[in-house]
């Protein structure tokens, strides 16, 4: 049964944030609100959590998960990013974008796209998520909470608790966007839109 945690969206209570961090550090799987709908999240070393996320979303082993980072200092440990791309990405973050970039050796091999050795990263514009990432001290491995047959991510914590109570360890109630991220692939050196979503794509076209 999932723990239901109602955290203030503007002033997240540290005690409640720490409760969620404890779940993550115990290899738990959480559902949490972001600026692009709800997402599933686990800590970096949680191998079993990857399989649990795949099972919930009916994903195959080729699905690429995202590293949700607190800031550029953290993001820079996991991807290679040159000055020109850095300026472009920085102008769009924090925000509802996922950027595909070449992975560093800090990225677990199971998270890399095998042919390109790349990984998706993002910095969300969401106070609650920022508080969670600060307390955790590392990125979350994450995927949009988009259930099989749905076209948009789930946006209500209590509905997620009701529907996925037996397969999650915690659900955070909070404000969430209604569209998934816009995905921008920089692995060729130039931006290519892989998915249109909440973020304005015109700055990359």
Task: Give a label for each model feature.
Residues 1-205:
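Active-site-adjacent structural elements in enzyme catalytic cores
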């Amino acid at each position: 049964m999932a723990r239901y945690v109602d955290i203030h969206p503007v002033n997240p209570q540290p005690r409640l944030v720490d409760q969620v961090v404890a779940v993550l550090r115990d290899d738990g799987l959480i559902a949490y609100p972001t600026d692009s709908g709800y997402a599933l999240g686990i800590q970096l070393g949680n191998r079993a959590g990857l399989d649990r996320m795949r099972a919930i979303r009916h994903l195959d082993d080729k699905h690429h998960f995202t590293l949700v980072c607190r800031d550029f200092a953290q993001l820079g440990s996991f991807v290679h990013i040159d000055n020109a791309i850095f300026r472009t990405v920085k102008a769009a973050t924090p925000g509802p974008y996922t950027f595909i970039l070449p992975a560093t050796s800090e990225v677990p091999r199971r998270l890399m796209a095998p042919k390109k050795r790349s990984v998706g990263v993002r910095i969300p514009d969401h106070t609650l998520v920022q508080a969670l990432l600060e307390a955790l001290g590392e990125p979350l491995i994450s995927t949009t909470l988009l259930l099989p047959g749905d076209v948009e991510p789930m946006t209500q914590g209590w509905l997620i608790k009701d529907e996925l109570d037996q397969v999650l360890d915690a659900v955070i109630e909070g404000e969430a966007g209604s569209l998934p991220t816009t995905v921008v692939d920089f692995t060729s050196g130039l931006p290519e839109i892989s998915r249109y979503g909440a973020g304005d794509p015109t700055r990359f076209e």
